[in-house]
Amino acid sequence: MTTAKINLLDFDRKGLRAFFSEELGEKAFRADQVMKWMYHFGCDDFDQMNNINKKLREKLKNKCEIRAPYVSEAQHSSDGTIKWAMKVGDQDVETVYIPDGDRATLCVSSQVGCALECKFCSTAQQGFNRNLKVSEIVGQIWRAAREIGLEKETGRRPITNVVMMGMGEPLLNMKNLIPALEIMLDDLGFALSKRRVTVSTSGVVSGLDQMTGKIDVALAISLHAPTDELRSQIMPINDRWDIDAFLASVRRYIASSNANRGRVTVEYVLLDHVNDDMDHARQLAELLKDTPAKINLIPFNPYPGSPYKKPSNSRIDRFMKTLMEYDYTVTIRKTRGDDIDAACGQLVGDVIDRTKRTKVKQQGEAIPVKTV
């Protein structure tokens, strides 16, 4: 029986040094050399690591591998946005590349599917399958950098910002999220500034409290409603941790953080005639008066089967102006990639649907026809 090789992308620097010492009998600086090859040069071939002696390279080839998710499908938008379905094991997750001048943001997934059942989210329709490993989280960045082109080839960083806003709830995968964030920030890893790495949460207070004082990155919170009654209707997690508990944990985190510069980004998806009238805007302004915040309004991205609609431009504009009357900094998220499957999780949902239909065909069974 062949022993599975150890994927070195699963280790942060501390873990990699321990592995080299305890399993390979090597000094810490050797681990550092290999880490630099993996992340600075996008190298997954031990034989190319020309400052590593041959004996160690042979050890590494026998026991280890550097294996990132691979692209199973890609959609390219006319505005430069790329949405990838990345294969993790026998499943897919979504990773989205969003270029904007000198800035290039990568939206990264943390889970296969999601357990939170937010009513407006395409990913929620797929249910929850499993947490991603460290290698599957950082591997999305590694693979995207390879797809876009390494810094040494293009003269510029392929990715300047990472947002943990893809499929899944990051704070329900704390065991793998923390070392993945460490790799993103590490000078031998992706060497990103802590202000250029953002974790978004729908309100997992226990996870946010674990992060407090342990890892310092930018924080974004998915609020989406100004009252517990409405939030519980569209985000069932609110029944576990209500708005007051959530915002209290947010204040604790930003008080311990330098990356957030004293305030949090509040994400608020605008659903037509659900959470987007002027009373909602005023309630939101009052709700956040004790929580220093900038507010990012997100016009809803429709997806097949969704019961919600995007508000009119006039409703979006009125909502924004009402908040600005309370002296909040308010932005409206720019629509990107609207000529491809724009809603988070939609591409993978399509991949899953096609896979199921192919299996049914192969089994010779009838294929159900969707009615409109």
Curated annotation (Swiss-Prot):
Cofactor note as given: Binds 1 [4Fe-4S] cluster. The cluster is coordinated with 3 cysteines and an exchangeable S-adenosyl-L-methionine.
Q: According to its UniProt record, what is one Pfam family this protein matches?
A: Radical_SAM
Which BP terms from GO are recorded?
rRNA base methylation; tRNA methylation
Q: Which residues form the Radical SAM core domain?
A: 100-339
- Coiled coil, from the record: none
Where does the record place it? Answer: Cytoplasm
Residues recorded as binding [4Fe-4S] cluster, renumbered to this chain, are C114, C118, C121
* EC number from the UniProt entry: 2.1.1.192
Q: Which InterPro entries match?
A: Aldolase_TIM, Methyltransferase_A, RlmN_N, RNA_MTrfase_RlmN, rRNA_lsu_MTrfase_RlmN/Cfr, rSAM
Entry keyword annotation includes rRNA processing? yes
**Disulfide pairs?**
C107-C344
> Which residues are annotated as active site?
E94 (proton acceptor), C344 (s-methylcysteine intermediate)
* GO CC field: cytoplasm
GO MF, one example:
tRNA (adenine(37)-C2)-methyltransferase activity
Cofactor(s) listed in the protein's UniProt record: [4Fe-4S] cluster
Q: Is Aminoacyl-tRNA synthetase one of the keywords UniProt gives this record?
A: no
Listed under catalytic activity are: adenosine(2503) in 23S rRNA + 2 reduced [2Fe-2S]-[ferredoxin] + 2 S-adenosyl-L-methionine = 2-methyladenosine(2503) in 23S rRNA + 5'-deoxyadenosine + L-methionine + 2 oxidized [2Fe-2S]-[ferredoxin] + S-adenosyl-L-homocysteine; adenosine(37) in tRNA + 2 reduced [2Fe-2S]-[ferredoxin] + 2 S-adenosyl-L-methionine = 2-methyladenosine(37) in tRNA + 5'-deoxyadenosine + L-methionine + 2 oxidized [2Fe-2S]-[ferredoxin] + S-adenosyl-L-homocysteine
Keywords, in A-Z order: 4Fe-4S, Cytoplasm, Disulfide bond, Iron, Iron-sulfur, Metal-binding, Methyltransferase, rRNA processing, S-adenosyl-L-methionine, Transferase, tRNA processing
Residues the entry annotates as binding S-adenosyl-L-methionine? G168, E169, S200, S222, L223, H224, N301
Miscellaneous: Reaction proceeds by a ping-pong mechanism involving intermediate methylation of a conserved cysteine residue.
**What function is annotated for this protein?**
Specifically methylates position 2 of adenine 2503 in 23S rRNA and position 2 of adenine 37 in tRNAs. m2A2503 modification seems to play a crucial role in the proofreading step occurring at the peptidyl transferase center and thus would serve to optimize ribosomal fidelity.
**What does the similarity note say?**
Belongs to the radical SAM superfamily. RlmN family.
Listed name of the protein: Dual-specificity RNA methyltransferase RlmN
